[in-house]
Amino acid sequence: MATETLDEKTPEVNSPAKEEIDVVPKEEKEVEKEKVDSPRIGEAEEEKKEDEEEGEAKEGELGEKDKEDDVESEEEEEEEEGSGSKKSSEKETVTPTSERPTRERKKVERFSLSTPMRAPPSKSVSIEKGRGTPLREIPNVAHKLSKRKADDNLMLLHTILFGKKAKAQMVKRNIGQFSGFAWSEKEEEKQRARIKEKIDKCVKEKLIVFCDVLDIPISRSNVKKEELAVKVLEFLESPKETRDVIIADQEKAKKRKSTPKRGKSGESSDTPAKRKRQTKKRDLPSDTEEGKDEGDADSEGTNDPHEEDDAAPEEESDHEKTDTDDEKDEVEVEKPSKKKSSSKKTVEESSGSKGKDKQPSAKGSARSGEKSSKQIAKSTSSPAKKQKVDHVESSKEKSKKQPSKPQAKGSKEKGKATKKGKAKAEPTRKEMLEVVSKILKEVDFNTATLSDILQKLSDHFGVELSHRKPEVKDVITEAINAMTDDEEEDEEEEAEAGSDKEKEEVKGEEEEEKAEAESDKEKEKEEPKD
């Protein structure tokens, strides 16, 4: 309101000043007029007086008005000062008196650099000593912990053991230091019940993982969740070793075994599986030192009940395969003997039947007998020859299929043998052939095996020949083939001799028949004469 009154009164204050400004030029004009118009001085004086009177009256009015304005302005200033002090004190709370709507002022929030509140450092887990051995001192548990990452399973196990979570870096270390629950005697039952509840809340898969980490023996197929929970709780009360077998040593032994096997498979990948198995058998008697090392490794490996050892079934399969190979060799040795006996029997039967069936009937029967004897001789010789050819071809194929690796092994073994003792040189192929032919004449083919002949050869020469087993096999087949050839030649000669005898017998029979016929004719002639 004070501001409005001031604005209204300001033009009244300024108005007399304008009038005064206008008064001065009028007086000057009047003086000039008096000078110009001297005759009109009287009139001018009168007018002047009138003007002066009017001016005085106006000045009086203006003076009064100025005084009133000054008083009002002073009052307004005082009011403004009072209202200004009040407004300054009550700026935020007082609403404006005007009818126009106004928004309330927002409070100014001053920026202040406040130091950030640091989170209190997490208390390190206090690990008390329990009744059992620390988990890091149990070799199998330490080995399995070292191979695992600090995943959710280990974090859960940590919370069960210590009742707190920890950083991923500290989880495995803390679990390794755990040596059992340190319960007070008074609260032992309560604390056991709490931990049992925590373990029961876990899923069966989690409990199986705990058993694996803590090296607790379980059968995964038939185990129930309750049994797993009981076993885990019993172990955690007083941890200790569950078995004597150390997994780390076992894995090292497996690595030793796997490295040479990989080399073998890489070298002889093109060779057939049967030949590989035969080479394994050949290497068994010669590599005694390697066999001992592998045997020790196998003995360590078989102690583990949880992990399946592949060594034992492999050895059994190798033995079975070697037995089958020996049986095959026996069959091959028995075949030529059967051939010999069958050929002899057929020749004897043919000769015997021919000797017995002497009919004094006609020449046709004799000719048919000769033809049949020739056919039998041919038939006996032809299957023997076919079998011989097949046998030679099979031996050639076997020699071709034999991998280059056994030869290399044989050379290595030869080197070992020469290093051990260079007393006797190994026999040549010709020498072996001569001795084998002698042995085959003495040996019974129905019972003899390749290993028996090989043993006799090694005894004869005083040298171990197991690494030359394929070569010995070829030598035996050669000797058998030579023997069968000789026997076939003998049989052919015997057959030819038998056929000559038969021819002579037939001729004698024919002559006898002729003589009998002539004698009969003579008798018939003599009878009518009588």
Curated annotation (Swiss-Prot):
- Ranges of biased composition (kind: Basic residues): 253-263
Compartments (UniProt record):
Nucleus; Nucleus, Nucleolus
Please verify whether the record's keywords include Nucleus.
yes
Specify where the region named Disordered lies, as residue ranges: 1-130, 246-430, 482-530
Annotated Gene Ontology cellular components are: nucleolus; nucleus
Motif residue range(s): Nuclear localization signal 2: 343-350
Q: Where is the composition biased (Polar residues)?
A: 374-384
Q: Where is there biased composition of kind Acidic residues? A: 69-82, 286-332, 484-497
What's the stated role of this polypeptide? Chromatin-associated protein which contributes to the modulation of chromatin structure (such as super-helical structure of DNA) and function. Binds to chromatin of protein-coding genes throughout the genome to regulate nucleosome occupancy and chromatin accessibility, and to modulate the expression of target genes.
Record note on quaternary structure? Found in a mRNA splicing-dependent exon junction complex (EJC). Binds specifically histones H3 and H4.
**What's the protein here called?**
DEK domain-containing chromatin-associated protein 2
- Organism from which the protein derives: Arabidopsis thaliana
Q: What is the lineage of its organism?
A: Eukaryota, Viridiplantae, Streptophyta, Embryophyta, Tracheophyta
Gene assigned in the entry: DEK2
